[in-house]
Curated annotation (Swiss-Prot):
Lineage of the organism: Eukaryota, Fungi, Dikarya, Ascomycota, Taphrinomycotina
Gene3D superfamilies: YVTN repeat-like/Quinoprotein amine dehydrogenase
GO molecular function, one term: RNA binding
Keyword Nucleus on entry: yes
Primary site of residence: cytoplasm
Protein name, as recorded: Eukaryotic translation initiation factor 3 subunit I
Superkingdom of the organism of origin: Eukaryota
Quaternary structure and partners: Component of the eukaryotic translation initiation factor 3 (eIF-3) complex. The eIF-3 complex appears to include tif32/eif3a, SPAC25G10.08/eif3b, tif33/eif3c, SPBC4C3.07/eif3f, tif35/eif3g and sum1/eif3i. This set of common subunits may also associate exclusively with either moe1/eif3d and int6/eif3e, or with SPAC821.05/eif3h and SPAC1751.03/eif3m. The eIF-3 complex may also include SPAC3A12.13c/eif3j.
Function: Component of the eukaryotic translation initiation factor 3 (eIF-3) complex, which is involved in protein synthesis of a specialized repertoire of mRNAs and, together with other initiation factors, stimulates binding of mRNA and methionyl-tRNAi to the 40S ribosome. The eIF-3 complex specifically targets and initiates translation of a subset of mRNAs involved in cell proliferation.
UniProt keyword Nucleotide-binding, yes or no: no
Source species of the chain: Schizosaccharomyces pombe (strain 972 / ATCC 24843) (Fission yeast)
Length: 328
């Protein structure tokens, strides 16, 4: 499984995303640009320039016509995927740490940082119809996270619920229509930050990764933890694979401690676990810093990882992966 290595950023990666068809890969980093690549050969298609701070997050709509991004310059921006033109800009008092389109691409959520006396929020907007659509600047609702600072968020199937992961290890559920708080649950160890939240393709359950070295699969309707994946290192990212019942986890020793460690001791591998049996199946090496973000190809043919080292590594699963059968 030889990867394609994409070198298009000068700073650590923050998030990578495939589009709905899987033919494009978008990468965000702390160097103020978003790159888009052909996922099958690693050719760079273009760059989205305009942000003036580290870019934390991006998302693409189903038709791959619009891309939304959030950054440390306290803005969320909407882009034309094809031309790279900035179509719309929303301004906030603090940095935008996570953005996501809902399932029918009519709304966007933005998670903002708790900073300088401002409370952390999850703000939901309508997707603008045109560049001159001034009404889209007004939020549909604003959730002020009462539990602790929200770090990640996402929409469930049919935009029924909105889930948030928090700095204290809890996960909260909100009514996605009204923004009303439904319930909160301490899923991870208290005081351990939830670093990622990704849904299974049908959005009926999702996986969280956490600094407490575990990842947990949670059912949308029952709000119960259905699976727990134990590792020996703080996790930054986790994702399900749509073909084969696996989860891929990424993390490693904290970036600030990395200079004192060999790559093997830093535990910078991507880890594959059996999604149902919770057993580790294997690891993929390559990055020489913590893995910050993992995205799985929508058709399950491969995955990409972005690291603190500034590289994106695109992997394609070989025949052995698809033939693999776990024996008890």
């Amino acid at each position: 499984m030889r990867p394609i290595i994409l070198q298009g950023h000068e700073r650590p990666l923050t998030q990578i995303k495939y589009n709905h068809d899987g033919d494009l890969l978008f990468s965000c980093a702390k160097d103020k640009v978003i790159n888009v690549w052909f996922s099958h050969n690693g050719e760079r298609l273009g760059t989205y320039e305009g942000h003036t701070g580290a870019i934390w997050t991006c998302d693409i709509n189903k038709s791959s016509t619009l891309m939304v991004s959030g950054a440390a310059d306290n803005t969320m921006r909407l882009w034309d995927v094809k031309t790279g033109k900035q179509l719309y800009k929303w301004e906030f008092p603090t940095a935008v740490k996570r953005v996501e389109f809902n399932e029918d691409d009519t709304r966007i959520l933005a998670v903002t940082e708790e900073r300088m006396g401002y409370a952390g929020t999850v703000t939901v907007f309508r997707v603008p119809i045109s560049e001159s659509d001034a009404a889209a600047e007004t939020p549909l609702y604003v959730i002020t996270t009462r539990e602790s600072k929200a770090t990640v968020a996402g929409w469930s199937y049919l935009s029924k619920f909105l889930f948030t992961g928090h700095e204290d290890g809890s996960v909260s559920r909100y009514d996605a229509i009204t923004g009303e708080f439904v319930e909160s649950k301490q899923v991870h160890n208290s005081g351990s930050t939830i670093t990622d939240l990704q849904f299974y393709p049908d959005r009926t359950y999702f996986i969280t990764s956490c600094k407490d070295t575990t990842a947990k699969a949670i059912d949308v309707d029952s709000f119960e933890v259905i699976k727990t994946y134990l590792t020996d290192t703080p996790l930054n990212t986790s994702s399900f694979t749509p073909v084969q019942d696996f989860v891929i986890l990424g993390g490693g020793q904290e970036a600030r401690d990395v200079t004192t460690t060999a790559a093997r001791q830093g535990k910078f591998e991507a880890r594959f676990y059996h999604a149902i049996l919770e057993e580790e199946l294997g690891r993929v090496k390559g990055h020489f810093g913590p893995i910050n973000t993992i995205a799985v190809h929508p058709k399950g043919t491969g995955y990409a990882s972005g690291g603190e080292d500034g590289y994106v590594r695109v992997h394609f699963f070989d025949k052995n992966y698809f033939d693999f059968k776990y024996t008890l």
